[in-house]
């Protein structure tokens, strides 16, 4: 069963959604093989015996695709993501152009379905050259809009490390008056990260548009012992 919503306010129109969209009432993963039910994030498997693994040094791209609404998004993927080992996308859309790009690159990929519209699935998507050993998702509904923001948790075998690398692709809660849901979402993912014994990558669109949000994120990152990865050269821009 799904929850159906129709856009009535200008705040929803800012999301670029027009018409009726549906929010699944359970977690679903979209893959090249089809839509499958989500699994329990508490029970990742052992990865030591995996036949293929990420190299010890690998490239990664993190990008909010804005539902493919901006010009030249495909050219951007070809330039910045096609040759990478890992690609963490937010606001991805399973339109034919995106699916063709994934097939052409022979990528392994999973998307945590936030909502659907017109047969297209939207949500965070993690793309890799190496098959994942485990993947699960955590959704957090926006308090005002009720559209989920998501964290996709993937475990990949890593050469020389029996625990593998845990990759968290996060699109953080954005539209709320305070920070309660934002903090709860980060705390839920932090609990999963604490249980992993190997290396961790936390990336995505954190929506740290206020000093308080940035402070809270930095606090959790410090508690986890993570270090910020600065691109070289650093060509990032703010919207």
Where would I find each of the regions flagged by the language model?
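Proline-centered loop/turn at the N-terminus of a beta-strand
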Residues: 85, 108, 199-201, 227
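Alpha-helical elements of Rossmann-like donor-binding domains used by nucleotide-donor carbohydrate transfer enzymes
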Residues: 75-76, 153, 184-188, 219
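N-terminal, active-site-proximal structural segment of metallo-dependent hydrolase catalytic domains
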Residues: 2-12, 16-104, 116-120, 187
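Active site of divalent-metal-dependent phosphoester/diester hydrolases
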Residues: 27, 108-128, 147, 179, ...
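His/acidic metal-ligating clusters that form di-metal
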Residues: 157-168, 178-208, 212-215
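Catalytic metal-binding/acid-base residues of hydrolase active sites
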Residues: 66, 93, 171-173, 206-207
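Structured beta-strand-rich core segments of catalytic domains in phosphoester-bond hydrolases
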Residues: 27-45, 86, 90-166, 170-172
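Sec-exported extracytoplasmic/periplasmic mature domains
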Residues: 81-82, 103-104, 132, 194-198
């Amino acid at each position: 069963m799904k929850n159906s919503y129709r856009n009535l306010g200008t705040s929803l129109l800012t999301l670029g959604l027009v018409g009726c969209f549906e929010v699944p009432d359970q977690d679903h993963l979209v893959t090249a093989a089809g839509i499958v039910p989500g699994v329990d994030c508490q029970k990742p498997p052992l990865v030591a015996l995996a036949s293929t693994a990420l190299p010890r040094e690998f490239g990664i791209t993190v990008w909010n695709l804005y539902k493919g609404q901006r010009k030249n998004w495909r050219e951007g993927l070809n330039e910045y993501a096609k040759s990478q080992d890992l690609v963490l996308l937010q606001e991805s859309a399973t339109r034919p152009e995106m699916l063709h790009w994934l097939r052409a690159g022979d990528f392994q990929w999973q998307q945590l379905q936030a909502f659907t519209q017109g047969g297209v699935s939207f949500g965070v998507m993690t793309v890799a050259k190496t098959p994942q050993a485990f993947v699960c998702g955590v959704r957090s509904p926006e308090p005002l809009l009720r559209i989920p923001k998501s964290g996709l948790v993937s475990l990949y075998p890593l050469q020389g490390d029996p625990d593998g690398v845990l990759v968290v692709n996060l699109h953080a809660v954005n539209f709320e008056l305070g920070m309660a849901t934002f903090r709860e979402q980060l705390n839920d993912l932090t609990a999963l990260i604490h249980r992993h014994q190997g290396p961790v990558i936390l990336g995505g669109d954190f929506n740290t548009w206020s000093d308080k949000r940035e402070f809270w994120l930095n606090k959790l990152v410090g508690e986890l012992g993570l270090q910020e990865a600065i691109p070289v050269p650093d060509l990032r821009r703010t919207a």
